[in-house]
């Protein structure tokens, strides 16, 4: 490698590090100037202020539940995609992993429509809000389980399982799973669980829209951050932001540490085969794929249908009618928001600029 390449490589690392670290250092300096350097006090402030009470417990509880449900839903999908051959498999994989690349507000609006008065009509029951949030997180993160687990399942040499069937510890599916599959895939499952937990732990839009009265650390910070770092004005908000940031930093650091360990364990230590030889036909897998596809596309379909339902206000009441007025307003714009063409152009400019 030439000296110029080394220089530009080092320069890129320095610029990236500066862009990442310097804003954080400035923010921390301003917040600590107001709150003082007391990490224990920052964390204690979360339960001492009414705005942030119970946020720590709720954040951990919903993240753990979301992770468990995501694995329960996602692993069977990864199994049938990895072990069996399917027509239009790339299309199926794209559909099943689509939620992860969609804005989280899409998931929120989709599930609110499903649970609303024109769906299952359970939104008025506040006890369903928590479950709606957990299912929305699972919908959003099942792509992680598929992406982490499917490559392992789709490339393992089938001779291993055939040989294990001849041994006493491989007579049943459970014994084969225990002695062959689980040791091979548990690093991938754990890695997917770590990432799912982090995304659920730091969730904002889904929590803000679905569980209106409950808040995570992320949504609490967003609520009070406008007054943080200002001396003499709502100084407790600086404590809340610092405490929540510290907890999130420790969670993220722990997850990255676990991921680095699991990444080493996920390195290929067995003989791999081509997917063409590993995967077989199994029509029973459709009993997994069809419900999974329905689960993935249902929120999207509900949003599309909802975009054609418009509230019509009359003198004494309001009703919903089917109309394209919503699309017309989106395309033409108004004083409150730009037209669709301008918003799309801005998105493309920002995305290509960031990519460059």
Residue ranges of each PLM-predicted region?
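Helix-loop-helix hairpin linking two adjacent transmembrane segments in secondary transporters
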Residues: 225-250
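Alpha-helical transmembrane segments of integral membrane proteins
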Residues: 258-288
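Cytoplasmic membrane-interface regions of multi-pass membrane proteins
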Residues: 85, 120, 157-163, 264-275
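A short amphipathic helical element positioned immediately N-terminal to and/or at the very start
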Residues: 1, 38-48, 178, 322-335
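Glycine-rich helix-loop "coupling/hinge" segments at transmembrane-helix boundaries
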Residues: 203-234, 315-320
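Membrane-water interface segments at the C-terminal ends of transmembrane alpha-helices
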Residues: 4-36, 49-154, 184-211, 242-260, ...
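Transmembrane helix boundary and interhelical loop/hinge segments in multi-pass membrane proteins
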Residues: 35-38, 148-162, 171-173, 201, ...
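Short helix-to-coil transition segments within interhelical loops
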Residues: 84, 156-185
